UniProtKB/Swiss-Prot annotation:
Helicase C-terminal domain boundaries: 283-437
Annotated Helicase ATP-binding domain residues: 45-249
Binding annotation for ATP: A58, V59, T60, G61, S62, G63, K64, T65
Keywords noted in UniProt: ATP-binding, Coiled coil, Helicase, Hydrolase, Nucleotide-binding, Nucleus, Ribosome biogenesis, RNA-binding, rRNA processing
Principal location: nucleus
Pfam families assigned to the protein according to its UniProt record, in alphabetical order: CTE_SPB4, CTT_SPB4, DEAD, Helicase_C
Name the UniProt record assigns to this protein: ATP-dependent rRNA helicase spb4
Function, in words: ATP-binding RNA helicase involved in the biogenesis of 60S ribosomal subunits. Binds 90S pre-ribosomal particles and dissociates from pre-60S ribosomal particles after processing of 27SB pre-rRNA. Required for the normal formation of 18S rRNA through the processing of pre-rRNAs at sites A0, A1 and A2, and the normal formation of 25S and 5.8S rRNAs through the processing of pre-rRNAs at sites C1 and C2.
Subunit description: Component of pre-60S ribosomal complexes.
Organism phylogeny: Eukaryota, Fungi, Dikarya, Ascomycota, Pezizomycotina
């Protein structure tokens, strides 16, 4: 155990934690250059180690990962005896594969300083150095990472049975599959701690039911920690169900003005830039080049996966060769996501990650200098998470959100109310209309070479609009205010797509582009061959349909229409009888008797009404006869 801290030690010193941290943990954080704890670590670690349930809300980039990893490791290594084989001591649940992988890597780095755990984790033959052997009774932490898409559930179970890990780090779905196996045990005698990282994100992604199923498989007597940059009402529901008298830790940031309720790091400069739709994508390079030194790692956020796919082909034309653009979104296969994520992390030249909100939460991407929100997020809560990819762990960072002139500028005041103030981007940027036109033509030149790019652009534009229309700040982001033609030119579209929002649009849907659409081809030969076949089939089917309609219209007699009308009436009557029959069958005897009495009463009323009508007709006829008897000149008709 680490020695007691000397008098006068800062309350944020690692040596000041009570109960004291192990010597090897102190060595680990010292080797990483963490001379003292962050505020969230200083608050959460002692509580979580002292057998308290915790709900931790702290700004992004504030060191939440170590706030739960250190207590988990310390707890498992202070047990009276090792956890039994195939029993689990702790579980850490993450919303995304990338975040789970990152937590796993941090844990491995930490356990490298604990020889028994390091020896258990390192596969034999990994290097030539002899492996130190420890007895079976030695306490150690052995983690397993569970990720959907990279391994099968059967492979996960096989690894679990072979290595008997006592800590699981996983996304919800794959974790539930493993816990459903009868070979995996989480009894109260073994299970100690559950951590939900980015808890509100877990619920936003629709994992609530899965989480509830997981909680039902875990003992109620456990320590639970919820960690997030924002705690939503949905998280409060999980708190009520899954935590016992939790301690809430809320860490705020004190800015230079003394305001203490900012929700983002003080080292992060959050700005906005107003730009017309036609100039939006053209402003990206000037933003990058106006900052000194030039950002080495930048993240561009857009609203949809389709947008990432399309802009990944278009933006390099505008950014030039100075920046490497790397796409990443949630619909990429798992291996592609991991490959592109690693490319960005390990890049040694100025690089840009073009992504969706899959990268907005939890990921500790080192040395991100700049975040540009090309599309403001639909959910305002996501805004601070996006910004927080820069300015992490005290590092200086800049974030920029792009807004259209007009009503969208009200977003600045909206963010101020939400305690996430933004200031104007400090470097003036000027784009001319001629520059915008040149960029549009350059994009269209590329798109005209392959119809697949046109299809991708149409899909991306429609999906962007759907996202825009669902913005929670709908009074600010109004579809009715959009300049369709300017947007079409900005995106480099060859025409505006067909969609309900353009039903009343009276402008130029072709965007001034003259193109031979019938001969506009795909680069992929198989796809182009199929397109031509479909065109031919459509032409033949259209001709046949026209011929059939003509023959049908010539041969249909008026009497057939009468027959059809009679048949329709007959079907309606039969349907009514069937409904009445089903209703009668569902009645009780009492209800049937009451229905009979009601029917009898109605029949009596109808009969009386009919008798009254017959009497009135008779009286009327008698009156007319009397009048006729007194009229000698009454016309009797022709013979």
């Amino acid at each position: 155990m680490a020695p007691k801290p000397p008098a006068g030690t800062s309350s944020r010193a690692w040596e000041a934690v009570s109960p004291s941290l192990s010597e090897w943990v102190l060595d680990a954080v010292a080797s990483w250059g963490f001379s003292k704890m962050t505020p969230v670590q200083a608050s959460a670690i002692p509580l979580f180690m002292a057998h308290k349930d915790v709900v931790v809300e702290a700004v992004t980039g504030s060191g939440k990962t170590l706030s739960f990893l250190v207590p988990v490791v310390e707890k498992l290594l202070r047990l009276e005896e090792p956890i039994k084989k195939h029993h689990i001591g702790a579980i850490i649940i993450s919303p995304t594969r990338e975040l789970a992988s990152q937590i796993h890597q941090v844990l491995l780095s930490l356990l490298a300083f604990h020889p028994p755990s390091a020896a258990a984790i390192k596969p034999p033959g990994e290097d030539d150095a002899p492996r130190e052997k420890f007895s079976a009774s030695t306490l150690k932490v052995v983690p397993q990472l569970l990720l959907g898409g990279s391994t099968t559930p059967a492979e996960d179970l096989s690894y679990f049975l072979k290595h008997s890990p006592n800590v699981l780090i996983s996304t919800p779905g794959r974790l539930l599959e493993l816990l459903s196996s009868p070979h995996v045990h989480c009894p109260q005698s073994s299970f100690e701690m559950l951590v939900l990282d980015e808890a509100d994100r877990l619920l936003d992604l629709g994992f609530k039911e899965t989480l509830q199923n997981i909680l039902r498989r875990l003992p109620k007597q456990r320590r639970t920690g919820l960690f997030s940059a924002s705690i939503s009402e949905a998280v409060d529901q999980i708190v009520r169900v899954g935590l016992r008298n939790p301690v809430k830790v809320l860490v705020k940031v004190k800015g230079t003005s003394g305001v203490q309720d900012k929700r983002t790091p003080a080292s992060l400069q959050m700005t906005y830039l107003t730009t017309p739709p036609a100039h939006k994508f053209l402003t990206l390079r000037p933003i990058l080049t106006s900052l000194q030194p030039t950002p080495q790692k930048t993240i561009f956020f857009v609203s949809t996966c389709s947008g990432v796919d399309y802009l990944a082909a278009i933006l390099p034309l505008l950014l030039g060769d100075d920046f490497q653009l790397i796409p990443l979104h949630g619909k990429h296969p798992a291996n592609v996501r991991q490959k592109n994520f690693n490319r960005f992390i390990n890049a040694h030249t100025p690089s840009i990650l073009l992504t969706t909100d899959v990268a907005s939460r939890g990921l500790d991407i080192p040395s991100v200098d700049l975040v540009v929100q090309i599309d403001p997020p639909s959910d305002p809560k996501t805004f601070i998470h996006r910004c927080g990819r820069a300015g992490r762990a005290g590092r200086r960072g800049v974030s920029v959100v792009l807004l259209h002139p007009g009503r969208e500028e009200d977003y600045v005041s909206f963010l101020e109310v939400r305690k996430t103030p933004v200031t104007p981007f400090p470097h003036p940027i000027s784009i001319s209309d001629s520059d915008a036109s040149t960029a549009t033509e350059a994009a269209r030149k590329i798109i005209k070479q392959d119809r697949a790019l046109h299809d991708r652009g149409q899909k991306a534009f429609v999906s962007w609009l759907r996202s825009y229309s669902k913005h929670q700040a709908s009074s600010i982001f109004r579809v009715a205010d959009l300049d369709w033609e300017a947007l079409g030119h900005a995106w480099g579209l060859l025409k505006l797509p067909k969609m309900p929002e353009l039903r009343n649009f009276t402008g130029d849907r072709t965007l001034g582009v003259d193109l031979d659409w019938e001969n506009y081809a795909y680069k992929d030969k198989q796809r182009e061959k199929r397109r031509k076949e479909v065109l031919q089939e459509s032409a033949e089917a259209g001709a046949q349909q026209t011929s059939n309609k003509r023959r049908a219209s010539e041969s249909v007699a008026w009497s057939n229409k009468v027959d059809q009308k009679n048949k329709k009436q007959k079907r309606r009557e039969q349907k009514h009888l069937q409904q009445e029959k089903r209703r009668w069958e569902k009645m009780t005897e009492e209800e049937k008797q009451k229905a009979r009495e009601t029917q009898k009463m109605l029949e009596e009323i109808r009969q009386k009404n009919e008798e009254a009508r017959a009497l009135r007709r008779a009286e009327k006829a008698a009156g007319k006869a009397a009048d006729n008897d007194g009229d000698d000149d009454e016309f009797e008709g022709f013979d």
